[in-house]
Amino acid sequence: MSDETRERDIYLARAMGWRYVPPGPETAEMYGEGVHCLRDPEGRLRATLFSSSVGDLWNHVTPQFHEWESAKAKLLRWLAADEARWTAFYNEIDALYDEFEAFYNEIDALYDEDESARETQFSVVSWSRFLVTLTPAQVAESAEKALRGLTAEKGENT
C-alpha cells in the first residue's frame, strides 16, 4: 500500500472519530503498561504490539478503507449520517454514477431488442446497486475529496 493511500485511510479514520489514547490506567488494564492505543468511533480501544511510535500505531490499527468492504460500508454509513457530508460525497461520485447508468442503459437497450428477455430486464438503475459496485478505493478517494472540500469551505466561511 502506498504512503498516499495509507495517509488517506488515516485521514478518513480521524474524520470518523478515531482518537489517540496515550498509555495510562485504561490502556494498561486491557493491554499492559506503556501500550499506546486508538479509540474507534464505537469507543473500543485498539492496539498493536508491532507499533514503535504513535505514527506507526495509526498505520497499523486504522481501517484500510481502500481494501476492506467492511470499512467501505462503515464509511458510507458515516457519510450518510450527515447531510453536508453526504451531499459533498454525492457530488464527488456523481460522474461515476453517470458512467454506471450509461452502462446499464446499454444493457437495457439490448434487452429491448429481444422480446423474450423483457421479464428479466433492468427496470431501474438503482442507487444502491451503484454503491455496491464501487470499490473500497473509489469510495475512500471520493470521501477524502469531499471531506477536504467541506473543510476548505468551512475555513472560507469563518
Could you describe each region identified by the protein language model?
Residues 1-158:
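Glycine-rich anion-binding surface patch
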